[in-house]
Amino acid sequence: MTAPKCVTTTTYLVKTKEQPWWPDNAIRRWWISVAIVIFIGVCLVALMYFTQQQARNGSGSG
């Protein structure tokens, strides 16, 4: 039985972690900052959606 693709990719990254498979530290830093910005944006959108749902449910018929 073959392992899932994500598992093989993770093991590949772990095996090649000793080698500098990132071209530059700046690129890694840029990707980390992009991931953080996307994560914060998703959290804000989810929070806004949740508050709107709560307000709509609380107001009832209006």
From Swiss-Prot:
One of its GO terms (cellular component) is membrane. The chain crosses the membrane at residues 30-50. Coiled coil: none annotated. Disulfide bonds: none annotated. This is Protein UL148D. It is a single-pass membrane protein. It is found in: Host membrane. It comes from Human cytomegalovirus (strain Merlin). Keywords: Host membrane, Membrane, Transmembrane, Transmembrane helix.
